[in-house]
């Protein structure tokens, strides 16, 4: 079975044709439970997200701030496994028809087996994978299997990436380029920063692939700011925080849906 890279490409192109940025939500699998995590993904999509990244929780998430680490810890204590990530992708995609990616560090895939992981992700209806710590020069095996199974390979670029490095990354990536707008770990910050705009400009000089910005957006005004210069706005910690701060799971889901609706206005310039 082929994965849904084309659905991802079409979704991003449709947003562009509407003169807006795409809204991409990040939520960890297994948080607060596997079923609850699936409901959260569906709530984000119902609220207005175009795409969702499902995180594979990791015990040492080097790029993630305290909010996502807390959610990952809850998911790991609950015993979340790769099979649960695949179930999350499958059920969310079947319920919504929207593109779902997995965001994961390389080590779990390496242990699980690249062919097994890509085949199962495609079979679940996944659109691709974001691999923040996989160096491009070590990605040939992954890309071979991802291409075979119709999955996007999304690499992360940062303000510290030199122009030659950006060209190297964008030459082999697919789906979109994940531009990390601030150096350091994920979280919500007061200002997304001018660094992001410069990074998008430099990345676009090397590719026609959409460039989406993550790390720092938490409200409609910030989403509108980023949507002014990027092809997509990626929001993670703000969704997770809504769930962590909620008095119960139902309120958490409503918080996710409401935030997605607010951000969806932002990417349309209605903030």
Curated annotation (Swiss-Prot):
Its pathway, per UniProt, is: Amino-acid biosynthesis; L-tryptophan biosynthesis; L-tryptophan from chorismate: step 5/5
One GO location term (cellular component): cytosol
- Keywords associated with the record: Amino-acid biosynthesis, Aromatic amino acid biosynthesis, Lyase, Tryptophan biosynthesis
- What chemistry does it catalyse, as a reaction equation? (1S,2R)-1-C-(indol-3-yl)glycerol 3-phosphate + L-serine = D-glyceraldehyde 3-phosphate + L-tryptophan + H2O
What positions does UniProt annotate as the active site of this protein? 53, 64
UniProt enzyme class: lyase
Please give the InterPro entries that the UniProt record associates with this protein. Aldolase_TIM, RibuloseP-bd_barrel, Trp_synthase_alpha_AS, Trp_synthase_suA
Q: What top-level branch of life does the organism fall under?
A: Bacteria
Q: What is its EC number?
A: 4.2.1.20
Q: Which GO terms describe its biological process?
A: L-tryptophan biosynthetic process
Enumerate the GO terms in the molecular function aspect.
tryptophan synthase activity
Claim: Lyase is one of the keywords in the record: yes
| Function of the protein | The alpha subunit is responsible for the aldol cleavage of indoleglycerol phosphate to indole and glyceraldehyde 3-phosphate.
Homology family: Belongs to the TrpA family.
On assembly, the entry states: Tetramer of two alpha and two beta chains.
Protein name per Swiss-Prot or TrEMBL: Tryptophan synthase alpha chain
Organism (species): Streptomyces coelicolor (strain ATCC BAA-471 / A3(2) / M145)
Q: What is the lineage of its organism?
A: Bacteria, Bacillati, Actinomycetota, Actinomycetes, Kitasatosporales
